[in-house]
């Protein structure tokens, strides 16, 4: 089960970072490939992603856990989705911690994807792609909050 973690520190107050990462409508501004977000509720939303070929792909997420100013966990709903054939589990965890001395914020992004069937053979590729996605997300998040 590929688990990939990336972390960074931002010269931005915790509440500014939290306001961005906790708002699904801000995802197109910082999460890679997200074109727009639809059907937002307190418990979930749909990301419309752009494939490598330029086609839109819908990915439904639920908010599994939220501790204000500390942690968010998103679970991707895989049943009856284009991702169901390859994945049996997919989740993203966002952890935040404030450095009270400097006023900066540490951000940890963690992606967990459990592959299904023969797709398990692609684990190294999935891990690399997840690492690129998380690194891009951190870079874009930094541009927004700093």
Predicted regions and their residues:
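Hydrophobic/aromatic beta-strand elements that line small-molecule binding cavities or substrate pockets
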Residues: 6-8, 58-65, 88-98
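Beta-strand/loop substructures that line and gate deep hydrophobic ligand-binding cavities in soluble
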Residues: 79-136, 143
